[in-house]
Every structure is written in C-alpha cells, then in structure tokens.
C-alpha cells in the first residue's frame, strides 16, 4: 500500500496541506488479473473531499467512485457512491440528497434504484420517507432516526447516550423492539453496553 500527498499519481492533483492525493495497493486473485487498485482524491478550496476516483491498474473506471457536494456552511448536500449492484453490473448504490434545518440534517433521500450485491455493504438504506426523519433535543443530540429505526435516545448529564431504543431489525416490526443501555464512569468512559 502506498499513500501519495505532494506527488501526482495516476492523474491526481498534488496536495500540500496534508490531504492524501492518491492511494494504491496490490491485489491478486486466481487469475492475477487485477494487479494494482487505488483511488485518487479531489478536494475543494476549503479542503473538503469532493470526489474519489477508483482505479484498476492505473486506469480510472468509476466502479467504486464517490462524489460529494456541500452547502456554504459545510454540510453535505449530496453524496453519490458507485458499487457492484444486485444485477451484477456496476452502478450507483447511493444517490443521497440531504435536507437541513439550521445545521441539523432532518431528511435524507436516496434516488439509487438498486442495492449493492455484497452482504454487509456500507451503503445508506432509505427506510423512511417522512418530512422529518431525524429529531434532536435542545442540546443538539439526536433523539430519533427513522431510517435506522431508532425510536428514542436518552442522554445522561454528560450528553452521552445511556439508552437507545430501536424497532426490530427484521423490517422494523412495530411489535418488536431492541434496547441498548450504556454505563459510563464519572469521566465519561464507557464501561458497559447491555442489549435487551
């Protein structure tokens, strides 16, 4: 694995402020056809990541590329991520649009039409289509997340979550809830997690 900063690598723009301009690594499979894989990284004038370009053997192919857009406050407005789809083709697995009230996200929509093919894929699942999918308390702590089935989060005096209640993972059945309890020391170190 190699990281590149001030050097241009596979068409990346050199970065002189500490950002990574590119990464590559070696991969082999049964036919040894993949050789090297990597990413190039692009940033805006505020040093925010705006795009990752996926490469195989030094050639861009967008199979696992990502792009980001931001508002003037630095909040993510959109995120588009490519990957391997259930159909066996490569395409968009996330096409997210974020809506805010102040600087707090209240809704995320996903326009992607197909899910990734691999189990455990880290992509957004748009389980809710509500006007307000995320709520917060007066301190800015998240209270609910409709897309993840989080129905309530209780916080301690340090603003650390002490109880998270969720709908069942099995299609968020209303009659089945899971709860996670957290115990902390006086300085905020998490001591225990209990699942019920």
Predicted features, each with a name:
Residues 1-196:
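Acidic/glycine-rich beta-solenoid
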